[in-house]
């Protein structure tokens, strides 16, 4: 009997990716975040599509249209809050997914890793532009501050910023183009995610030990499909708890005030998931230096395969590296806290120390620890 699942041109692609895919028998729950990111993306595209049906990308009506969605559209409030808090869940999953890759040495799959970094940048760009759309105070001033950073680029900076703005300030043209980009980018992200998966399936998944699992593979279905469904249920539970009980917990109250170019909010800050990078940007008292540090704080991920000096792939059997990894996590949490604080003593110095520590850990301490661990293994 011929199995259609294995012969049909389209179904066999799905079959080879999600059903008969040989997977390591020992991958832990840290491997759930890839599928959770896929679910987040689908959820964001669907809720975003329904929001776009009622939203108007015009400075005069954008704020009112969001209010209209929440008050007058059937279940508009839940769609809006699922979209806003869905972004937070998306970034939680992203950080966990990247952290897993760093801990278990998954970055040695070069193509998969590099596309992953591009995906991270694309998602950050999408989230930033989405935050501008409600046209509240923080939307407007956030857009002004972040786009203005490009003026630090020598020679072409000012022209570049005005070109992005479509004028001499953040205005109607900026809002319209941000909406256009915010709408198209998730589909580009979806396409890149498929390429990400394509490259992953060329090599097969990594596993917690970092050792080849070719000798012990199990089919993806039913083992990991059921595991992914459990993860998805927990994700949706967490999202709905946030949406239904405290939808504005992660938002900024300033964004409930319509955008006013004549009135600057006392503390301009981005959404919580950008605060670590924002803290690094602010910790350098030079505009160009700050912008470079901001970009490098994410771009440094590209260097991870080059900085891998250990003879072992995973950190599972490397206690010194494990210790440094968790210090790095604590450092990022510190930066996130600092990013949300005003620029005053003692926050300035804490931010500067945490920023130095961030680059020092990744560029110096972790590769050095790996080298030390290599020599410790020679009995």
From Swiss-Prot:
Gene3D superfamilies: Cytochrome Bc1 Complex, Chain C (1.20.810.10). Its cofactor is heme b. It comes from the Eukaryota. It is a multi-pass membrane protein. Heme b b566 binds at residues 97, 196. The keyword Amino-acid biosynthesis does not apply. Component of the ubiquinol-cytochrome c reductase complex (complex III or cytochrome b-c1 complex) that is part of the mitochondrial respiratory chain. The b-c1 complex mediates electron transfer from ubiquinol to cytochrome c. Contributes to the generation of a proton gradient across the mitochondrial membrane that is then used for ATP synthesis. The cytochrome bc1 complex contains 11 subunits: 3 respiratory subunits (MT-CYB, CYC1 and UQCRFS1), 2 core proteins (UQCRC1 and UQCRC2) and 6 low-molecular weight proteins (UQCRH/QCR6, UQCRB/QCR7, UQCRQ/QCR8, UQCR10/QCR9, UQCR11/QCR10 and a cleavage product of UQCRFS1). This cytochrome bc1 complex then forms a dimer. This is Cytochrome b. It comes from Gazella subgutturosa. The gene is MT-CYB.
